[in-house]
Amino acid sequence: MPFSHTKIVGPAGRYGARYGMGLRRKITAIEIKQRGKHRCPSCRSLVRLKRLAFGIWQCPKCGFTFAGGAWVPQTVMGKTLTPEELKEVEIQKARWRETGK
């Protein structure tokens, strides 16, 4: 069987002409982000993290295993807030409560 990945379709080339172009474009976008280099939260090195299971990631350099997103290691919702950012959020909540009453 010939090599199914090409420069144009990327990793979705393994599906051939099946499933439609829209879905294959979405898959390509997800898989390029998923297999790209990400920063390890423990050793801070920029490496290709290994996906062990759905949302479980491991750094090949330090061996640190952590929970992240399903398709990418760090999600926007899972971003850790610094204490200063957390205080700012609490201040904004208090202002909102005062204006709402």
UniProtKB/Swiss-Prot annotation:
GO terms for biological process: translation. A zinc finger (C4-type) spans 40-62. GO terms for cellular component: ribonucleoprotein complex; ribosome. Keywords: Metal-binding, Ribonucleoprotein, Ribosomal protein, RNA-binding, Zinc, Zinc-finger. Binds 1 zinc ion per subunit. Belongs to the eukaryotic ribosomal protein eL43 family. NCBIfam families: PRK03976.1. This is Large ribosomal subunit protein eL43.
